[in-house]
Every structure is written in C-alpha cells, then in structure tokens.
C-alpha cells in the first residue's frame, strides 16, 4: 500500500486496487504510531499508550511514563480518582516539553502526596502485578495494575515523503 505523486496527481495503491486522484486525505491521527519503550512485559494487556477514562483506574496502582503534556495531564486526571495510586516516571531530571500550567498542577499534587514522582528514572520491566523502575542505580519494584506510556508517536515520515508531502519540524517552548 502506497501513495506516490505522478505528474500532479497521486497514484494510490491498496491491497485491492490502484486509483489515481487529484487529492488525497490522510487520516493518520496527530501522533502517528505510539512510540514503544521496548521493555519486557510491554505487550501485556494492562499497558496502553493513551488514557481514555481515568475512572477505569479507580483503586488501582497506575504507572504513567513520560514527560510531556500528555503524561502530566494523565497523572493529574488520575489523581482526581479516589483510591488510585499514581507514579509518574520520566527519564530526564526536569520537564522541558510540558506547559507551565501542567507542571504547576503536577507539582501541587506531588506536594500533597497524590502523585509519586520518579525522575530521572527508567522503566525496566513490566510484570502482571508489578513494575521495575531504575532510579539512582537502584531498581525499585512497585505494585502495579496498569501502565500508561505517553512517549509520543512515530510519524510515517518516509511514506509521507514518497507521497510528495513536505514536512517541517517545529519545536514548542517549555
């Protein structure tokens, strides 16, 4: 399956046909394919890459992995759910990519003891009832019912280039 530009038109190849079109609408989402961490246990059903409903995690131990707005917003939303134990793990020592208001809300909940912050840290293993996190050269094993990985996405860059789509990378400010 492919899309290539050909003389001002697009040739769209699917598993069933080849079509020509003057325009093509790509509905691939904003993030593309979620970025995985390639850690043992990441294929368990308790691992997701986007939080849909914080209520589904009521009374659970939840690990959120990431340092951008999606991760901070997920942790903050989970903190509002009764009896939920939230840990946020991020590989860097500070949140360079998250908006100030998200960092401030997170800091407040960390001070209140609603969110445990582990940074810099690295998720090393996911088990059915626990996770192993490396921090300060020490592995901590935490009870765990769910893992939400907010590590961004991988765009289909080569596919888009072949289709004649010009891309420009822009970086936000903290």
Enumerate the predicted regions with their spans:
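Short, well-ordered coil/turn residues that connect adjacent beta-strands
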Residues: 22-23, 28
């Amino acid at each position: 399956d492919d899309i290539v530009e050909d003389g001002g038109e697009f040739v769209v190849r699917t598993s069933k046909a080849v079509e020509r079109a003057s325009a093509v609408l790509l509905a691939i989402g904003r993030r593309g394919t979620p970025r995985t961490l390639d850690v043992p246990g990441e294929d368990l059903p308790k691992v997701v890459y986007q939080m849909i409903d914080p209520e589904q995690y009521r009374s659970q131990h939840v690990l959120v992995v990431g340092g951008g707005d999606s991760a901070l917003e997920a942790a903050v939303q989970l903190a509002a759910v009764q009896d939920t134990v939230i840990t946020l793990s991020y590989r860097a020592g500070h949140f360079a990519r998250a908006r100030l208001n998200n960092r401030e809300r997170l800091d407040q909940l960390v001070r209140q003891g609603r969110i445990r912050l582990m940074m810099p840290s690295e998720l090393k293993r996911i088990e059915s009832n626990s996770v192993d996190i490396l921090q300060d050269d020490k592995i901590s094993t935490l009870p765990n019912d769910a893992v939400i990985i907010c590590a961004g996405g991988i765009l289909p860059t080569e596919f888009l280039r072949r289709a004649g789509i010009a891309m420009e990378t822009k970086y936000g400010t903290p």
